[in-house]
C-alpha cells in the first residue's frame, strides 16, 4: 500500500516535469532550453525510482520488510532534489508531498534519522519559493518531522532550524515587507 502511494506520487512528478519540459508558448519561453533539460532529468530520475519501487514490491516473500523497502535514500530523494532546484511551484509542491510521505512512513524504513538533515536542507532551499501552496507544504513537512517518533530531531540546533523555518514560512510577504 505504501509503495503504491509513493509510485503514484513519483509518477505525478514525472508527468509534471514532462509537461513542463514539453510545453509550448509562453511557458516554454519562460522554461528555457536549459530548464527543459532539468525537466528531462527530473522525469528520468523519477522514472528510475518508479522502477526501483516496482522491483522492491515484486521481490519474494522471504525477504524482510526492511530490506524489501529500503532503497538508497540518495536515489529516492534525487528527483525531489532536482524538483526543488527547479523552483517551479508545481514541481516543488509535488516534491515536498513526496518528502512528507517518506518522512511519514519512516517506521516502515523509507526514511531514516540520518535523512533529517537532508530534508531540512531541502526545505531551506525552497523557502524562497513564495507560492502559498509551497509554503503550506513546508509547514506541513516540518510538522511531520517534528511529530515523527523515529525522526524527531535530537539536538536543539536542528529543532531550532525547523521552528525558525516555520516562522519564516508564516511571515507575510507583501509589498511593504522586506
Q: Where would I find each of the regions flagged by the language model?
A:
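N-terminal alpha-helical scaffolding segments that mark the starts
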Residues: 1-59, 65-69
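Core helices of alpha-solenoid repeat scaffolds
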Residues: 10, 69-80, 112-121, 135, ...
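Helix-loop junctions that connect tandem helical modules in alpha-solenoid scaffolds
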Residues: 19-38, 79-88, 105-107, 121-131, ...
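Residue-level signature of alpha-solenoid helical repeat scaffolds
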Residues: 48, 97-98, 140-144, 164, ...
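Eukaryotic helix-linker segments that join adjacent hydrophobic helices
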Residues: 49-53, 59-61, 71, 95, ...
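HEAT/armadillo-like alpha-solenoid scaffolds in large eukaryotic assembly and transport factors
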Residues: 57-70, 106-116, 148-160, 177
Amino acid at each position: 500500500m505504501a509503495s503504491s502511494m509513493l509510485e503514484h506520487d513519483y509518477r505525478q512528478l514525472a508527468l509534471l516535469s514532462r509537461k513542463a519540459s514539453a510545453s509550448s508558448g509562453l511557458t516554454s519561453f519562460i522554461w528555457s532550453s536549459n530548464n527543459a533539460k532539468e525537466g528531462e532529468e527530473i522525469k528520468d530520475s523519477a522514472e528510475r525510482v518508479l522502477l526501483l519501487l516496482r522491483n522492491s514490491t515484486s521481490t519474494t516473500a522471504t525477504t524482510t520488510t526492511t530490506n524489501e523497502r529500503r532503497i538508497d535514500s540518495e536515489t529516492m530523494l534525487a528527483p525531489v532534489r532536482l524538483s526543488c532546484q527547479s523552483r517551479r511551484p508545481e514541481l516543488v509542491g509535488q516534491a515536498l508531498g513526496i518528502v512528507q510521505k517518506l518522512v511519514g512512513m519512516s517506521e516502515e524504513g523509507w526514511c531514516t534519522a540520518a535523512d533529517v538533515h537532508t530534508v531540512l536542507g531541502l526545505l531551506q532551499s525552497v523557502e524562497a519559493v513564495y507560492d502559498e501552496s509551497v509554503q503550506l507544504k513546508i509547514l506541513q513537512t516540518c510538522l511531520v518531522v517534528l511529530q515523527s517518533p523515529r525522526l524527531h530531531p535530537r539536538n536543539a540546533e536542528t529543532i531550532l532550524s525547523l521552528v525558525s523555518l516555520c516562522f519564516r514560512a508564516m511571515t507575510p510577504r507583501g509589498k511593504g515587507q522586506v
